Amino acid sequence: MACRWQPGMKITALLDALNSALAEPFALAWVSDSPRFLLVFTVIYAVVVIVTVTDQKNTRPGAEHGSAAWGDVFRLNKFYMDKRGPNLLLTQHFHIGIDGYKHKHNTNILIVGGSGAGKTRTYGVPNVLECACSMVITDPKAEILRKTGNLLKQKGYEVIVFDLINPAASFCYNPFVYVHDDREVLTLIENLIQNTTPSHSKSSDPFWEKSETALLQALMLYLLHEAPPEEQNFSMVMEMIAAAEVHEDDDNYQSPLDILFERLEMREPDSIACKQYRIFKQAAGKTAKSILVSVGVRLAAFNLPSIAKLTMTDELHLQELGERKVALFCCIPDSDKSLNYLVGMIYTQLIQTLYRQADRVHKGRLPVPVHCLMDEYANISLPKDTFLSALATMRSRAIFCSIIVQNMAQLKAMYKDDWESLVGLCDEFLYLGGTEKETHKYVSELLGKETISTTSYNQSKGRSGSYSINHQQSGRDLMTPDEVRLLDNSKCILFIRGERPVVDYKYNLLKHPNIRCTEDGGAAPYDYTAADNALDDLPCAPENYELLDMDDFLPTEPAEIKPTIQRIRRPK
């Protein structure tokens, strides 16, 4: 450019000279004006660079108002499904392996769905039919047990039923069996108090609960250390409470229970049971009577003969769930919640027992994974802090939970300000549909906002009329609360930590490979009360047989003894 510069050049000539210089960029020569032109163009270049750098902004074209989008369920299934191991069935096209170490997620799943949304049919029953691990199943109305029991027996499961609908036929559960030291007694009593305290209780004075706790700790510690195993149960606790008489007008009166602890103190002055009983005895006569009445009312269910028998011994064998395939069904009535705290105690002691087995016997991880399928979770009385702590740590022990609720309002009522902690401890969230407004709003916010292109048209009429079209970017919810409410009943929304949400069809129970072995597939319903090898199961009619005379089959000499038990009966 310096070679073509001449003093007095007009702008048109200057542009022509610039074009010719650009046409021959390598025709270089050093002239007297070269330093001046080099300086000018260097300054211009520096100005352009400075303006460009200072004008840069953090722009995300197409995501100005949000980047939410739907994920691909088939791509997710390819990553999370365990092709060689057992899986959980979440939707028709998405399965997730129960071994969280492979996909780096826990398998705690929160399932939300209103009445009739298919919580049991599209999630609960299909995952029981998988027969992938040991299971503890909360089963309102015993529906899952009736449908799947026969299949589980065929697959080699031991089916155990804790039945609060029909306690007379239930397997027995004795909480004392799972108490191994004094510390666990304190934990059991704390959980019992929490489980039997109404969730909406507004008592501001903790005195009564603490006094009840001290008395119950004294009684249970006494039984643990002094009573034979057959007397270590809540029926005996109620007997001891009945023996704890208090006379308000006689401070020197000693009840049979007072004498019992007095004799223990003579033998063992440092007994922890005596220490806790002394705390209770510090209460004045009228106060002590109120404490006894309060404890008696709290544990009144154990005075019922059916419940006393139910908790007299133990047949659940919780420690075996992580060692072989066991299906423990906790059948609860859907119209009466008064005894549901027993199920809460089972879950609490189950977690403690499995943790002990994993840590002390199996080097930190159970050989058989355990799935806690908590249908109608709101009806289970579980201590809030204990369960949240377990939910955060159970993955490493091969334990996982499926928490099924009808709406988010239930969680908020149960956990108050901590409900989001429970949601955060579940890496998968499955929404099946419902009618509760707050749930619609929560799901909509969880989906996020997307950026869309909008076009607006403006037209003004008249003598000076005009017409314009305006294109712009705006944001909207991926699904508005109203769109969440209108979700197709055959579809569901699945959230996975770190992944985009997906919409997919709910799992079709009738397409499960094991459906023919269930009641839905035409098989007979399972009846756990029917005894194996009962008279009705014999292949022959008893009326066709007669009992022989004793002389016909008893040997006269010891050498003639043979295994001929079949000769007791013979056809007529």
Segments predicted by a language model, with ranges:
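A broad, low-specificity signal for short, low-complexity segments enriched in glycine/proline
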Residues: 69-76, 86, 91-101, 121-122, ...
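Compositionally biased amphipathic helical and low-complexity segments enriched in hydrophobic
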Residues: 15-19, 89-91, 405, 479, ...
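P-loop NTPase motor domains
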Residues: 64, 105-399, 414, 424, ...
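Short alpha-helical interface patches
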Residues: 17-23, 41-44, 50-87, 182-192, ...
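Intrinsically disordered, low-complexity N-terminal regions enriched in serine/proline/glycine
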Residues: 29, 44, 78-79, 86-87, ...
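Conserved ATP-driven motor cores of ASCE-family P-loop NTPases powering translocation/secretion/packaging/pilus
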Residues: 391-493
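Basic- and hydrophobic-enriched, low-structure N-terminal and domain-boundary segments
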Residues: 1-117, 121-124, 449, 460, ...
